[in-house]
């Protein structure tokens, strides 16, 4: 699973210059600079396979693509809708790794071939322009379902997933939907990282971003592997 989070770092000029700090609607600055951390985590063990840090304003997608250096054939990579992109699908596909990711609500897929389990086959393109120009797409399978709240029927959440596992007979939609919700294990890993291991005013101690901060953050993720076990 790939996901990201933001961590507070000490309020030094160097940290603020390298990593930045969020603003607010009122124009005030955050009390501390922040670093963005993107991690590749194994669902069952919470093992952190790989991690990258970047400035707060840099999007997770850029770093997530670099984390694909650590995926291998036979893995099933899961991601949330914020990481959905043609580039992510293409890069994962090129690594020989299967994927299962959530689709943003504003992204549409045509039902090209209806499958018996309710899912359907479609195609993903880099952009609408390239689609019109006949750019070769990647075939995907789309799974749609709704999760209902047992006590609040009106509180429904609609999910749409995209996957490289095209065979409904081998990989039924219900099985993949249940599998996807293991993605929340990455939230538990982040909780362990931030709350249990980094329970201090700022998550990273170092005042120097390029040396101490990187080393401190990497040591923390390695420690989390031991803690998670």
Name each model feature, range by range.
Residues 2-229:
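Single, function-defining residue in the core of a domain
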């Amino acid at each position: 699973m790939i996901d990201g989070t933001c961590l507070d770092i000490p309020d030094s000029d160097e940290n603020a210059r390298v990593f930045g700090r969020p603003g607010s609607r009122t124009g005030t600055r955050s009390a501390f600079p922040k670093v963005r951390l993107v991690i590749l985590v194994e669902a069952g063990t919470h093992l952190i396979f790989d991690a990258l840090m970047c400035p707060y304003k840099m999007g997770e997608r850029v770093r997530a693509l670099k984390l694909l250096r650590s995926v291998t054939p036979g893995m099933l990579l899961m991601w949330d809708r914020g990481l959905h992109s043609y580039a992510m699908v293409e890069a994962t596909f090129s690594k020989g790794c299967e994927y299962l990711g959530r689709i943003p609500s504003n992204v549409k897929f045509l039902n090209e071939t209806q499958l018996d389990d309710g899912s359907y086959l479609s195609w993903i393109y880099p952009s609408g322009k390239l689609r019109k120009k006949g750019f070769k797409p990647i075939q995907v399978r789309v799974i749609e379902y709704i999760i209902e709240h047992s006590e609040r029927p009106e509180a429904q959440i609609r999910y749409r997933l995209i996957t490289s596992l095209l065979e409904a007979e081998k990989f039924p939609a219900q099985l993949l939907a249940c599998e996807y919700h293991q993605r929340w294990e990455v939230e538990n890993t982040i909780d362990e990282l931030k709350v249990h291991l980094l329970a201090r005013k700022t998550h990273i101690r170092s005042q120097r971003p390029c040396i101490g901060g990187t080393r401190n953050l990497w040591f923390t993720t390695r420690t989390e592997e031991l803690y998670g076990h």
